[in-house]
Amino acid sequence: MKHIFRALAPMLVLFIFDIVFLFFFFFFSETYWASSILMHFLGGIAAGWSLWRLLSLPSFPVRLPGRIWRIYMVWSTTALIVVGWEWYEFILDRFFGSFHQLGLSDTMFDMALGLFGSGCFCIYLVFFAPTKRS
């Protein structure tokens, strides 16, 4: 359990940091719009990094056949996390009166930033990350 928490720590830290700003400071992202861009991009990177660490654990129950499959799993699972995050913002706007989703184009841009962040991390994994050689 300790290894799973360590693997998910980057995503959890960014999630908690973002929750504080979204929940307690409703108008923070409206006043500082660049923070939304940065948080969605960093959220994609943090989710990708956490999922990569989780898939690399020896105790993880599913073994994928190769590195490319793990990278694909990281990117596609990050896509699910990005959609879930936008649902979270929608619920805050709808039921708590915040203003995080300024419209459909803003929501699509936020999702694209999360996927772009995850894509940047996956490119790092393909070209720059060290691999285990036997």
Regions found by a protein language model. Give the residues of each.
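Bulky hydrophobic segments
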Residues: 1-103, 108, 115-134
